[in-house]
UniProtKB/Swiss-Prot annotation:
The gene is xynA. This is Endo-1,4-beta-xylanase A. Residues 20-210 form the GH11 domain. GO terms for molecular function: endo-1,4-beta-xylanase activity. It holds the Pfam family Glyco_hydro_11. Pathway: Glycan degradation; xylan degradation. Its EC number is 3.2.1.8. It comes from Geobacillus stearothermophilus. The active site is at E104 (nucleophile), E197 (proton donor). It catalyses: Endohydrolysis of (1->4)-beta-D-xylosidic linkages in xylans. It is an enzyme of class 3 (hydrolase).
Length: 210
C-alpha cells in the first residue's frame, strides 16, 4: 500500500546543517495537520496544547496530526497515544517533508493490519526499539509541491510500540542512520508532525504531542 496525500498549505522552511545531528529539546507545537481525500468519515478535533483526537470510519486516505511548522533533524518528539485503535490500514508515525531534495519521511511506531516495507537498507536502534530502514519511490504523485516524483524514507519499528504512556522519538538517530545508508534528506524543512494516518479503514486515536 502506498498512501497518497496532497497538502493544501504553503509551508515555511528552514536550513539544515551538514554532519551528524544531535538531539535537542522541542518547542511547543505550532502546526495542526488535517487532510482527507474525502472518502468516508473523518472526525478530527484540534485539542488544547499538543492534543488531538480523530475518529474515522470507512475512509479513503487521511492524515491528522500535531507538530511543528518547521521540521528539524535534531528534534526529540515526545508523545502519549492514550488511544490508538485502528481497524485496517493505519500508521502512528512521525511524518514530514523536506525540500531540496523533495523527500517524504516516516518514523512508524505502530500500525494496523499493514506494516509498511520497501527497499530494505538496514536497521537503527533508537528509544528502546529496533527499526527497519526502507526507501520507496513515488512517481507523479501528490506532494507539498504539487504532482512530483520523489523518494520516501522510512524507519519502521520491528514490533508495534506499546501505547498509553509517555514515549519519545529521537529523530536525529534516524537521520544519522539514514545518512549512513546514503539517504540524504533535503536542505530545507517543511512541517513535521506526530500523525495518525489511515487508508481504507476505521478506528480512533487520541494523541498528545510535545
Amino acid at each position: 500500500m502506498k498512501l497518497k496525500k496532497k497538502m493544501l498549505t504553503l509551508l515555511l522552511t528552514a536550513s539544515m546543517s551538514f554532519g551528524l545531528f544531535g538531539a535537542t529539546s522541542s518547542a511547543a507545537t505550532d502546526y495542526w495537520q488535517y487532510w482527507t481525500d474525502g472518502g468516508g468519515m473523518v472526525n478530527a478535533v484540534n485539542g488544547p496544547g499538543g492534543n488531538y483526537s480523530v475518529t474515522w470510519q470507512n475512509t479513503g486516505n487521511f492524515v491528522v496530526g500535531k507538530g511543528w511548522t518547521v521540521g528539524s533533524p535534531n528534534r526529540v518528539i515526545n508523545y502519549n497515544a492514550g488511544i490508538w485503535e485502528p481497524s485496517g490500514n493505519g500508521y502512528l508515525t512521525l511524518y514530514g517533508w523536506t525540500r531540496n531534495a523533495l523527500i517524504e519521511y516516516y518514523v512508524v511506531d505502530s500500525w494496523g493490519t499493514y506494516r509498511p516495507t520497501g527497499n530494505y537498507k538496514g536497521t537503527v536502534n533508537s528509544d528502546g526499539g529496533t527499526y527497519d530502514i526502507y526507501t520507496t519511490m513515488r512517481y507523479n504523485a501528490p506532494s507539498i509541491d504539487g504532482t512530483q516524483t520523489f523518494q520516501q524514507f522510512w524507519s519502521v519499528r520491528q514490533s508495534k510500540r506499546p501505547t498509553g504512556s509517555n514515549v519519545s522519538i529521537t529523530f536525529s538517530n534516524h537521520v544519522n542512520a539514514w545518512r549512513s545508508k546514503g539517504m540524504n534528506l533535503g536542505s530545507s524543512w517543511a512541517y513535521q508532525v506526530l500523525a495518525t494516518e489511515g487508508y481504507q479503514s476505521s478506528g480512533r486515536s487520541n494523541v498528545t504531542v510535545w
